[in-house]
């Protein structure tokens, strides 16, 4: 039995924090897991910036409502789910992901959760056990699944390397250079073909 585990941001949808950075005019918020492997450190830094600027969940959700999946992402996911089981493993948050999952046809997603005060301030976050994606893949394997994984960032490498097949998708030149043994693709058709060949 196979299950395909996909990253979300940068693979199926644009990076939420980059979109919010551009909309809010705060360039520091462009930093993502492509730049900072320590997710706890990255999120605490983001929360400090939000507090400093008086921004909360509503402002972020307003930007997310304008984001569409990457061109071809829904078609890729529909075709993939017609031939095998697939799940999205993301370090994003339920409060961010829901409108994007609707646009992608409601695929299954495992992600984290924000702690939000009554006034909408983001006060903290609850992460699944770290490293989340690797531990989720290992859990699938422990119940009899063969995993195939794809992502674009440092926090995807664990699940990619632990799977029977793993692929980088639209990753950075630095990550591709540092991990030349991981096949890297730029187009959904090529990724889909590689996944189908690994099934």
Residue ranges and their predicted role:
Residues 193-199:
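Short amphipathic alpha-helix with an adjacent loop that forms part of the alpha/beta core around
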């Amino acid at each position: 039995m196979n299950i395909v585990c996909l990253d979300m941001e940068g693979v199926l949808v644009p990076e939420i924090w980059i979109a919010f950075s551009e909309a809010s005019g705060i360039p520091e918020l462009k930093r993502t897991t492509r730049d900072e492997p320590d997710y706890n450190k990255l999120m605490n830094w983001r929360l400090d910036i939000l507090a400093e600027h008086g921004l909360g969940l509503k402002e972020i959700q307003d930007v997310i409502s304008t984001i569409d999946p990457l061109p071809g992402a829904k078609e890729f996911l529909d075709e993939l789910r017609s031939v095998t089981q697939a799940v999205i493993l993301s370090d994003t948050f339920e409060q961010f992901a829901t409108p994007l999952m609707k646009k992608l046809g409601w695929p299954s997603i495992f992600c984290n959760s924000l702690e939000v005060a009554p006034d909408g301030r983001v006060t903290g976050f609850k992460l699944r056990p770290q490293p989340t994606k690797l531990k989720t893949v290992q859990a699938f394997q422990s119940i009899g699944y063969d995993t195939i994984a794809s992502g674009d960032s440092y926090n995807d490498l664990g699940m990619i390397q632990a799977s029977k097949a793993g692929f980088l998708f639209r990753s950075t030149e630095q990550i591709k250079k540092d991990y030349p043994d991981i096949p890297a693709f730029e187009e959904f058709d090529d990724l889909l073909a590689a996944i189908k060949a690994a099934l």
